[in-house]
Amino acid sequence: FSDQQIAQLLEISPNIVFVDSSPDERRFDSVVLNFRLGVEQALDYLLYKGHRKIGFLGPAYKLDQKKRPALEARRQYFIDYMKNAGLYDEHLIIDTGLSAKDGSAQIRKWLEQKDHIPTALLAYNEESAITAVSNLREVGLRIPEDVSVISFNDTPLSILTELPLTSLT
């Protein structure tokens, strides 16, 4: 929301609750996804399934409400969890940037380093997961036999893929 839009909303009511993010967390309440819990649940599940070489797919930064670079929380929660588990490997973090085109190029570049292929990937959204699945299959890897993929944002996009995605909401 722009400052002008927020001012217009405040003219209607001083009681504003934002959904999915907040333009100013000190002034406004918000309802947001618990990304930390989602990352923990996904990684707990993958570890339970026997995976130890788990990668993360997503941007290092995203744009905040005012279009400023902000750390991507899911990525940081992933790094923290994997470090605490003694399984963190910086080579398994793929910085995809913010577009599918950038992501696809980064995934292809990363796949050329054959010794850094994980047995599982946690993608920060479905677009990244779909891009990863496509690129993994292009180099002959099977999903989920060779690489399991879990994504965030369980949207209708996940059912439009040839292989159904495992997604967190």
Locations of regions flagged by a protein language model:
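Bacterial carbohydrate/catabolite-sensing allosteric modules
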Residues: 3-169
